[in-house]
């Protein structure tokens, strides 16, 4: 039996999961997306060349790696084919190596229309969604009206279900939001055309992964977004529409939980958040501006600037607890080079009481006042460092303090965007 690894974000997303998934596929022979949609991009740098993937797993740049989209992913046919075309134009043989689960719900134009109409109607109270139809598609799944990938193989059933859904969504769009209706005929024609390209990629992903595991093939499960955006465990309602935690890999890919052997928690050396919602350690000052500029903190899909702040160890403790994190990978350590001092949030004052872990819900998190430790920064560079002993002493001390406060080992340190700019203390695949 193989040793399989789940990679998850432990903050509010944007931790740098794409680079590490790409790096880990030097050993993994299969990579699986198990939740989310094309609302988050994973940025890969190989030999100085940038590639952003949104739906296709980050292992696609390795020609000997099989890639899978599990049933927990909501799939936009248009976004998928656009991404495949971009990859293949760059010389990556994507479609031949990608398998899509039959149970993936389809994101269609009415989901996008409703998503955007809702956000516009909320004004200043908006959640900050990407407007790509992710939430409404998950709503359809729970309401048992979703059109799924398997429906593409039965045109008559697809037409019937599509007509019902278009009527339902147009009622909402025109009556509740005074928005333009969507065209049933256009959606049907466009989707059926795209279906001819998608159907050859459809497979029994659950059974295929089970067989690969039995054959001893190392599998990597690639999470999207981050634990603090999880629909159940995040700062609700300022969350995404899916479960972003390690446990979601089992239902989202159709595998038993016993197949998940090691959980790698990805965390930046500082904290960022996109969109609305509480952020206790946010720095709306020169420190935040420094981190944003040095870290190039802009969304890879949306282009939205990210809010920046100090490392929140109390929030990380919550993520470690929920995910059962085996080891941490600290990203973007090099961004902090040159800071005279670094603050580390070890807990909060909440209603006059000291708490050492992130509380539940956005109301409580909004009231949290961070309690900081101040550590000395470092003047030496960490850029491109590949050995622990070559890190500045204060950088080593910072990472060790994170381990002590959070209770999980730092197994990997990233010192730059490229694959090779990585320090490995313990390999997730046991190498």
Curated annotation (Swiss-Prot):
Source organism of the structure: Chromobacterium violaceum (strain ATCC 12472 / DSM 30191 / JCM 1249 / CCUG 213 / NBRC 12614 / NCIMB 9131 / NCTC 9757 / MK)
Active site: 14, 42
Residues that, per the record, bind GTP: 13-19, 41-43, 306, 332-334, 414-416
Keyword set, alphabetical order: Cytoplasm, GTP-binding, Ligase, Magnesium, Metal-binding, Nucleotide-binding, Purine biosynthesis
Biological pathway: Purine metabolism; AMP biosynthesis via de novo pathway; AMP from IMP: step 1/2
Binding of IMP, residues: 14-17, 39-42, 130, 144, 225, 240, 304
UniProt binding sites for Mg(2+): 14, 41
Biological function: Plays an important role in the de novo pathway of purine nucleotide biosynthesis. Catalyzes the first committed step in the biosynthesis of AMP from IMP.
Enzyme class: ligase
Cofactor: binding details: Binds 1 Mg(2+) ion per subunit.
Catalytic activity: IMP + L-aspartate + GTP = N(6)-(1,2-dicarboxyethyl)-AMP + GDP + phosphate + 2 H(+)
SUPFAM superfamilies assigned: P-loop containing nucleoside triphosphate hydrolases
PROSITE patterns named among the record's database cross-references: ADENYLOSUCCIN_SYN_1, ADENYLOSUCCIN_SYN_2
Signal sequence range: none
InterPro entries: Adenylosuccin_syn_GTP-bd (IPR018220), Adenylosuccin_syn_Lys_AS (IPR033128), Adenylosuccinate_synth_dom1 (IPR042109), Adenylosuccinate_synth_dom2 (IPR042110), Adenylosuccinate_synth_dom3 (IPR042111), Adenylosuccinate_synthetase (IPR001114), P-loop_NTPase (IPR027417)
Name of this protein: Adenylosuccinate synthetase 2
Subunit composition and interactions: Homodimer.
Record-level GO cellular component terms: cytoplasm
Statement: the UniProt record of this protein carries the keyword Metal-binding: yes
Source taxon at top rank: Bacteria
Underlying gene: purA2
UniProt: substrate binding residues: 300-306
Cofactors named for this entry: Mg(2+)
Subcellular location: Cytoplasm
GO BP, sorted A to Z: 'de novo' AMP biosynthetic process; IMP metabolic process
Family according to the record: Belongs to the adenylosuccinate synthetase family.
GO molecular function, one term: GTP binding
